[in-house]
Each structure stands twice: as C-alpha cells, then as structure tokens.
Amino acid sequence: MENLDALVSQALEAVRHTEDVNALEQIRVHYLGKKGELTQVMKTLGDLPAEERPKVGALINVAKEKVQDALNARKTELEGAALAARLAAERIDVTLPGRGQLSGGLHPVTRTLERIERCFSRIGYEVAEGPEVEDDYHNFEALNIPGHHPARAMHDTFYFNANMLLRTHTSPVQVRTMESQQPPIRIVCPGRVYRCDSDLTHSPMFHQVEGLLVDEGVSFADLKGTIEEFLRAFFEKQLEVRFRPSFFPFTEPSAEVDIQCVICSGNGCRVCKQTGWLEVMGCGMVHPNVLRMSNIDPEKFQGFAFGMGAERLAMLRYGVNDLRLFFDNDLRFLGQFR
C-alpha cells in the first residue's frame, strides 16, 4: 500500500504542474489507462489472499477516484484559463465608433408622390386608387373622349384587345369614385400610367397624380387658388403662376399651368427654352357630360380637376435633366436622394 500511496502522490504532483490539456491527457493514460500504473496495481489483487482482496480493492478504487478528480479539476481550470485568454485577445472595445451600414432610401419619384399627397391631405383631400388595366369605357367614354379622338390611336395607347388597355391617365379613378359616391368629393389619384412615348422627357410608363373636387358652388377661382397654393407649398417658394387657355375633352374651360422657371427665376435658360416659364400641369372645370355619365347632376354640382406628372415635378425639384435617369436603377444617381 505504500507503493499505492506513492503512485497517487506522484500522479497528483504531475497533475498539479501540468499547464496543457494535451499533457493532462497523457498523465491520465499513464496512470488510469488500460496499461496505466494504477490499473496494473489493480491486476495484482489476484496475488493476494482472498480475505485481503476486498479491502485492498477498495483502497485502489479510492486512489483512482482521487487521481481522476484531480484530473477533472485541473482540466476545468486549464480550459477556463484558455477561454479567458481567448476572450482577452478577442476583446471588443465598445468605445470605438461603429462601422457605418449602407442603408437604402426612397426613390425620388416616390418622395415626390408622397410630398404631393401630403400637400393635398392637409387641405382635406383623400387618396384614391384604381386598376392599371382599364376598360375602354372608364378610360375614354366616361371622360367625354369620343371614338374618333387621337388619344385612342394605337400609337398612343397600349391595347390588350378592343376593350381592355393600360390606362393612359389616372382619370378613370375619378370616374369610379363619382360612380360610387355622391358629392362632396375631394380626392387625389396617384399611380402609374402608360403611353407609347419614350425620349429625354417622356417614358412609356410614368407616374401621374390627378385631383378632383366636386361640390356645390365650385368655380374656376377655387381651382386657381388650390393650384397656386399647392405649387408654392411643393416648391417651398413664392412662385409666379400663370394659366393658359387649353383644351381637354373632360374639362371646360381648360387650362395649362406654367410656373416661373425654378432654375433661372424667370430670366431665361436652357431648361425653360429662354421663356422664363415651365409647364407643370393641366386643369379645368369638370365637363357637364362627365358629371352626367357618373349620375351627378351638373345643374346642382360643379367640379374641377387637375393632373400632373410626378417625374416632371421631380425633375424640376431635384434639378434632373433626363427623365430616363429615374428608371436606370443606377445607385450612383439614386444614392444622392437618401
């Protein structure tokens, strides 16, 4: 048994001075493995008298447990020290500034649409929407556009068949609203529209916002005041606004709206073609025929309507000279609007 005590003391000393988990495993194999020192002692039990074997066997088991406990404790200690060292090496200085993350932003046309909606919502207008695939009636007939009108030509309109087409304006939303509710009506209708046109200032798909107000006693003076206040709120400037007589089948009288050039302040430049004025929208009093076709009495109610291209206003607000830039998905361009 003195030999057993010496083996245990030797094993515990080795465990105590080990600084490596791998070396610790070698110690375990040396003392507790299949051919280990303590395992060999256990095999000598057969040489002892039968009455001594239980007592000696118990002592050997206690010795093995003592060594195993020491091994486990030292292993936990070494692993904890290794983890602490690794954490110290990988420590993050939380006082350092974080790395900036590239974030997206709203498209300039989306910004413009939301800005227009906000301007009109402040004065009681609601946002109305409708289908982009329209029927001929709501896109043309109900808006007093007869069959021989040039807008119905194939080179101006995308047709699916004789009756279905991609809407050429958001005016059908106004018609559907008048069909479903009686005055007073006060709405703006933003959305995508489609026309067979593509160049520096035109796109086959673009965004339009139209507005409609129908009530009793509505006059052109109300239309004029509404548009003037909207344009000044949108551009955040006191702009000169002028109305030029024009023609639209669904309004009478009709007008084109020009503003003083926001680039040169009316002095004349390339953008305004030296005129000092920029065309921004069309408008007019709702034609009595349009009201009748929507079951609204034109003798009792009057209304005005207006329409503008969102890309056109975005170009003027942000100083963009090519409409196609809005649809190129070039991050160098779009990143300027975050």
Swiss-Prot record:
Cofactor names: Mg(2+)
Biological processes annotated in GO: phenylalanyl-tRNA aminoacylation
Keywords in alphabetical order: Aminoacyl-tRNA synthetase, ATP-binding, Cytoplasm, Ligase, Magnesium, Metal-binding, Nucleotide-binding, Protein biosynthesis
Gene Ontology molecular-function annotations: ATP binding; magnesium ion binding; phenylalanine-tRNA ligase activity; tRNA binding
Matching InterPro entries: aa-tRNA-synth_II, aa-tRNA-synth_II/BPL/LPL, Phe-tRNA-synth_IIc_asu, Phe-tRNA_ligase_II_N, Phe_tRNA_ligase_alpha1_bac, Phenylalanyl-tRNA_Synthase, tRNA-bd_arm
Enzyme type, top EC level: ligase
Main location: cytoplasm
Residues reported in the UniProt entry to bind Mg(2+): E252
Subcellular location: Cytoplasm
A Pfam cross-reference name: tRNA-synt_2d
GO cellular component terms given for this protein: cytoplasm
Record HAMAP family: Phe_tRNA_synth_alpha1 (MF_00281)
Similarity-based family: Belongs to the class-II aminoacyl-tRNA synthetase family. Phe-tRNA synthetase alpha subunit type 1 subfamily.
Quaternary state and interactors: Tetramer of two alpha and two beta subunits.
Annotated protein name in UniProt: Phenylalanine--tRNA ligase alpha subunit
Gene: pheS
